[in-house]
């Protein structure tokens, strides 16, 4: 089998039924290849019983042609006119021979117009028009549409063959070799009995040469026909981008209206070749066809090559068009520009309100910018206060405005605005969790900077900046989550009153939003814990860098301590209900008992304490190591604890809001072995004295207390002992934090379940 036969079998999946593979001569193979390529490039379908036919009216009992009239690819402008005249003469001779001698083939007449080449084959009473329109060369010329019914043709309809669906074609044959073989074979000019394939081929060939000649004269833009399309196919097939035929055209006869199919082929250098699904436009006159094609070409740019090929098949069926790759087939009204679905760039093709995908360029932008571009409803921007907490530490617009929106208002829209916002928040939190591990300043100590003191000084400012940013982020996350839980419990209590008045749709939405809020709260807690781990790691690095200079590190340790003070001095904006206050007090007592059992000091909560401070204190304790009052008591070099000086000043000013048992005296060296004294052994006078102690002692005692006596003891044994204590307390702190977090989750989930069950029981009673 020759190379052309192999190429033909690759390009055509229906060679057995059409009889193409019965003759293996080179000219026959190229003849069929030309017919296949021309029709396939235009995306046309043939006049057959199904929609997958791509060759017009070819029966199995018909003889295959062996003659080839003219070369297929003639690029020169000077040589193209002579074969055109020869083609006209040969077409007339073929028509005469067919009328005189052959009764077995359908009639095929070819007529040349200045801007249009048409071939009309009529098997029996069926009509097929294969039209290639060259649009803006002669816009004033009219195109004749010939429909000649042949009374001489006796081809049975049962002889029309059905073809399988097209698949992706790879045309890898060199264009130069094809042209050379075509010109060699055209010189032989062997004559044989013509067939409908031969006549269609002759018409398409003349149209190709005319289009090629006239398209070379274009300056600004180019219209690709089947010859140019074959070249582009060859180029892109070499690179590995096959040109795909999206789908064959439908096959329902809409008479007398012609349906013009528009296939948009995007060819851009270095990118994948794409064929859009065909769009169909109802046409009445050829003048409109030319004007519309001209308008479609004016929208094309210089960098991309657009091939718009208009075909007027006699049989169209609109129902089968959505089977193509992108099933968007649009009907254009009379006189409108045909709508070819253009391929938008990847950022534009994604939905702007997508909740499950994020644009690739957004990973480099701050998280606060992500949320402002997505809001489509007049609801507060909640994710600005959650994920990008460094934008506003205390601004939580969502917390205040969420309670003012009843759920019944949101149930009018199927995807409610609040649900969209909650899903967006959840999505942003998860993205920030992923980005947090990729943040270069949070990946732990720099091994190269550890041995050299010259590099320590250069790394230190970066660590400090990152440390401060993480403090603000974690503090804002903690505050927002606290307020979110306040409002959530308040709303649950309010909903119990109106739950029986809600419809089923509103109740379903309430439950869905409740689940979303739970997910947001859990993700926020995970993010907060990860931030806390980064803070601990950075604080350890800063302590290691600043260890030779204890007095300089007092400012840094004070900065660490201000984190706890700020957290505890910012109460929740709303009063928490009685059950929540009892829950937080119970949780605080549990934490104090756990601290005593592990050998650490806990803290006391007086009964007269306000609910805001209890709630913020307990939630910050459960989710982070550094933000609770009990951690201000750990003075043995724990990295999460801070200097005594800065936290104590707000505590003196807010004695009514917050009290804690502090085991400190002004003289730090005398407290070597008494760090883990239980709070029961201390009186309230000692607490007050300890609160005022840093003001009296000055920076030296702050440094000694904050560092847990590491710089104050020069002996090597004391240093080793303190390092062991640090490691032991860090392990204890991690165990305690995990236990407290589990207990807190169980308590909160139990409370929410109790409220939900009471809500359901109230609704049942109301129904009865």
Swiss-Prot record:
Q: Where is this cross-link: Glycyl lysine isopeptide (Lys-Gly) (interchain with G-Cter in SUMO2)?
A: 317
Q: Where in the cell is it found?
A: Cytoplasm
Quick one: signal sequence residues? Answer: none
Composition bias (Polar residues) maps to 39-57, 102-122, 610-627, 667-677
Q: Where is the composition biased (Basic and acidic residues)?
A: 316-334
Pfam short name (any one): SSFA2_C
Q: Which InterPro entries match?
A: SSFA2_C, TESPA1-like
Which residue intervals are annotated with compositional bias (Acidic residues) in the record? Answer: 682-694
Question: Where on the chain is Phosphoserine found, per UniProt?
Answer: 153, 177, 246, 248, 255, 268, 276, 312, 378, 411, 549, 564, 569, 572, 627, 643, 670
Q: Which residues carry this modification: Phosphothreonine?
A: 665, 677
Q: Which domain of life does the UniProt lineage start with?
A: Eukaryota
Q: What's any one GO cellular component for it? A: cytoplasm
List the keywords (alphabetical): Coiled coil, Cytoplasm, Isopeptide bond, Phosphoprotein, Ubl conjugation
Stretches assigned to coiled coil = 468-546
Q: Where are the transmembrane segments?
A: none
Where is region (Disordered) located? Answer: 1-24, 39-78, 98-124, 315-338, 605-647, 663-718
Q: What is the protein named?
A: Protein ITPRID2
> Where is the organism placed in the taxonomic lineage, from the top?
Eukaryota, Metazoa, Chordata, Craniata, Vertebrata
